[in-house]
Amino acid sequence: MSLRGKDIISISDIKRSDLERIFRVASSRFQGDELKGKIIAMAFFEPSTRTRFSFETATLRLGGNYIGFEAAQSTSLAKGESFSDTIRMLDSYADGIVVRHSLEGAAKLAAELAEAPVINAGDGTKNHPTQAMIDLYTIWKERGNLDNLTYGVLGDLRYGRAAASFLKALNLYSPKKVYLICPEGLRPKQELLDSLKMPWEFSDLKDALPELDVLYVTRVQKERFPDPSEYERVKGSYKVDSSILKDAKEGLMILHPLPRVDEISLDVDSTPYAYYFKQAANGVPVRMALLSEVIP
């Protein structure tokens, strides 16, 4: 089924066949003209580096152009204009809208308001579908396969939308097992656990590490904690460094959606396990592939 003109709000909106078509396009994508004469609106109501820059780069490399903002304070939202009116205005100017917002459901609301396709660049704590595409593409590109692997997901599994989307994306495949590795206060919400279709269990890093083919690490999402004291209790409670990796399986891939704070030590960067900078670089070809598939 074609994604042309479709909204991409959750990774659950994507079929495995769609995802693997995006992977194939991304693996050969360096330049193109699919967006020639098209304008993409970048509606970033929340800070971003990699996501915004890679969407902008992807648009330019496909021959398109972009408009937008990187902070709500620089728009009429600062004067009291509503989110709805802002989206309607962007819809009248652009052929597609990329939305990032701190509030859950913002991208879905934008999709209901706009005629142009809306791509969710991360909203709330549940959805970051294009990050999940990049994560899975990185594994697929290196391994050629995502099935029958053992995954560990380490970090903030309660407030981290990248981790939540990664886990939901794995539902499209057949992992051997998934280990959820997190402090007690950062365990996933029950809704996410109930949605998982693969074998999973809670573990600690030391016990799970020797089995892992992929370790997906995320930072503690300080900005999403409702109570600052809750953040203080869990910050710094986990760290991957080169000493713990002595027990790692040969060929282990360590991924991180970035930015990192202190959850992966700098000494890991020079090990053969570090794939997170390759992962970040994959943002441009994957988003090029997605834009070329979605924008009418």
Swiss-Prot record:
Residues binding L-aspartate, per UniProt: 79, 161, 219
Highest rank taxon of the organism: Archaea
Keyword Lyase set for record: no
Pathway membership, UniProt: Pyrimidine metabolism; UMP biosynthesis via de novo pathway; (S)-dihydroorotate from bicarbonate: step 2/3
Keywords: Pyrimidine biosynthesis, Transferase
Catalytic activity: carbamoyl phosphate + L-aspartate = N-carbamoyl-L-aspartate + phosphate + H(+)
Residues where carbamoyl phosphate binds: 50-51, 100, 128, 131, 258-259
The keyword Chaperone appears for this protein: no
Gene Ontology annotations of biological process type: 'de novo' pyrimidine nucleobase biosynthetic process; 'de novo' UMP biosynthetic process; amino acid metabolic process
E.C. number(s) listed in UniProt: 2.1.3.2
EC supergroup of this enzyme: transferase
InterPro entries attached to this UniProt entry: Asp/Orn_carbamoyltranf_P-bd, Asp/Orn_carbamoylTrfase, Asp/Orn_carbamoylTrfase_sf, Asp_carbamoyltransf, Asp_carbamoyltransf_Asp/Orn-bd
TM spans (from-to): none
GO molecular function list: amino acid binding; aspartate carbamoyltransferase activity
Alphabetized PANTHER family for the sequence: ASPARTATE CARBAMOYLTRANSFERASE (PTHR45753:SF6), ORNITHINE CARBAMOYLTRANSFERASE, MITOCHONDRIAL (PTHR45753)
Complex and partners: Heterooligomer of catalytic and regulatory chains.
Family named by the database record: Belongs to the aspartate/ornithine carbamoyltransferase superfamily. ATCase family.
The name this protein goes by in its record: Aspartate carbamoyltransferase catalytic subunit
Organism: Korarchaeum cryptofilum (strain OPF8)
Organism placement in taxonomy: Archaea, Thermoproteota, Candidatus Korarchaeia, Candidatus Korarchaeales, Candidatus Korarchaeaceae
